[in-house]
Amino acid sequence: MKTFSKKILTSSIGLLMMGGGCLQLTFAEEVSVLPALKSEAQAQQQNYADGKLAKEAKLGALGNKSVIDTPFSVTTYTAKTISDTQAATVSEVLKNDPSIRETTNSGHLNENVQIRGFSVGFEDYNINGLYGMAPTGRIPTDIIDSVTVLKGPNALVAGMAPAGSVGGVVMAQTKRANQDLTRVSASYEDDGYYKSGFDVARRLGNNKEFGVRVGGSYGQGEHIIDGMDDTNSTGVVALDYTTDKLKLNFDAYAVRDKRDNGSPAMVGFIPCTPKLKASQCTTPYKLMDAPSGDSNFFPNIHGEQSSQYLGASGEYKFSPDFKVFAGAGYNEKEYSGHIFGTRLIVNNTNTGAASSQYYRVGYQEHAVAANLGLEGKFDTGAIQHTLGLRADYLTRNYWQHSAATSNAFDTNLYDPIVDASEQMPTSYPTIVPYVDNRYVSYTLTDQMSMLDDKLQVILGARYQDIDTQNLYKKTKYSSDKLSPSLGLVVKPFSEDLSFYASYVEGLSEGVTVSDITYPTATNKGETLAPYQTKQYELGTKYQVGSWLNTLALYQIEKPEAYQDSTSLEVKDDAETRSRGIEFSTAGQLTEDLSLMANLAYIDAEYVKSGTASQVGNTVIGTPDFTAGLGLDYKIPVVDGMSVNARASYVSEQYLNTDNSLELPDYTILDLGAKYATKIGGVNTTFRANVNNLTDEKYWSGVFGSNYAILGAGRTYKLGVTFDF
């Protein structure tokens, strides 16, 4: 266990003092009625910190809830945050909170994160509160309007994540025709990546009941690391018909990514064992300093991925107190080439000599999702109820082939070797049917309010049914679980100050004991029962004007599988526990200066394990302390000009489960500027951003045990938008 250092404590006090005051479908989430367009001033009143954070969040089975009335830790980053930071993907948006750790490199085609010590993979990102409908790999911001992060497991709000993530729920909200818009944009990144796009929205009809929004983007060129060339394109359509009683939506997106000549890398420091070859492990076993963030260890790589989606949804209000809703959607995803597995292993820590190899994988997925529900409001005496009943359905069918590999090739951590003879495999197996999974759940919620909203209670439960088939191994598995939840919000002094407590659970599929994962197990073929992760949380929230201040304390307990060393049976009574404290503050210090800051302390450890020496150790990739500070200043003497800065600090984190290797702490500084003016009567906004201003060389996090993630080097981005 690490100690809470004096340096960390000093940083905490300082920040606390400063924080005083594709084709895409929207399912049956509540959509804002749009009888009239909102002015910018009205929109700002619905947000914190000069429009960067939303005051309301869309929370799946609970509907739309204000942040102050939600008994969980939830943050929604708005379109303004996305545009001012020029974030290209959801993962780049999440960098506003350093406690959300990336477990894949910046710029990787697969974006995975860690929240509160537990992973959230890209397969478990969702669109508009539902799983299975997000693009493969990563979500480009060109198709979305906001990003909501609900920290910790929450089966009540979102159901069981199909890949088993329990660290949190990452929900992207798609674009909607909220107001008339005709926008053309262009951007340039250092090394020659150019991108252009358009975004057009209209409200039509006598009462503005019809909405249309169409957008697209295309980018191509070298960026992020030396020689890596990307070609990216998106297209999105959103249609809606909105009246006081009826809401109908149609959405579609298409996303394409093509990558050549490079990929960000994970670097392995693997302890040697008798079973490993010299090219598969590290000697002497120690950590090396990080190389330059723009190093390219895979110059002959190629990969591409695509996603497309269609769907429709509707909602009808029979009265102000009763409504029904339904939705359905279809998603196709595929990838081919060397998309992931971009890893090298350091063989000699004295010289930096390393080895790696190229892979080729293939994957296709078809997913269907649907929901049906109703919501009614009624009173029982002095208690106001909002009762919800909802059914959700998701099926995922996918095909894949085993990875084809090339021969291992030599390289060097500090001097990557370029050898044209080392190429990706040219032959590979045929894609075959692999998995057919079905998830059905039923949710019942009762949101109660009494004493003029001074006391609010959420009671809920989700019944989850799981049916999985491995078509390749010809195995089947079915199980079900009930996940109860309880939330309490108390406002004894003011409607702007709340205290809350909650208990929620998260569900993950039980592990299947196979020859590959447990070759010596005595219970091969058995699938363990679904894991129930439990979270207990206490907190307080205070809002005043543009300010939101939050404080949360939590504990998460997650069961884990392990193999008993005596019986050789695979069991599921190991446990990882995470405890932490999180503080955030956001608002306007003055009319011209806004702030977003956050602090987090986490103690994540293995409390039960099949390896006795591991008990009490810190979970890999979980820094004890993270801190972030973002400032945005409007320069009074230059109308339309503003500058912004963001500093992120991450303390030390362990690379392996025995805690013998530790990644150093680091601080990253990002700078930006924006200038809004009119050119020829056209509203024009120029933006410039520099990430990692000081070009730090650092290990940003942990991909998996013994694999460090190489942090991105300094990058530049220039952008301009024209609003006609």
Feature map (PLM): residue ranges:
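Conserved C-terminal beta-signal and adjacent last beta-strands/turns
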Residues: 12, 386-387, 489, 501, ...
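Acidic/polar loop-and-plug regions of large Gram-negative outer-membrane beta-barrel proteins
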Residues: 219-223, 231, 236-317, 332-365, ...
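Membrane-embedded beta-barrel scaffold of Gram-negative outer-membrane proteins
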Residues: 314-329, 333-341, 499, 529-608, ...
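Outer-membrane beta-barrel translocator/receptor signature
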Residues: 142-145, 156-235, 241-247, 308, ...
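Surface-exposed extracellular loop regions of Gram-negative outer-membrane beta-barrel proteins
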Residues: 258-272, 395-400, 490-537, 542, ...
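Structural signature of Gram-negative outer-membrane beta-barrels, strongest in the C-terminal barrel
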Residues: 365, 380, 384-396, 433-558, ...
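Gram-negative outer-membrane beta-barrel transporters
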Residues: 450-454, 553-557, 572-657, 694, ...
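Acidic, small-polar-rich N-terminal luminal/periplasmic segments of exported/outer-membrane proteins
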Residues: 34-180, 538
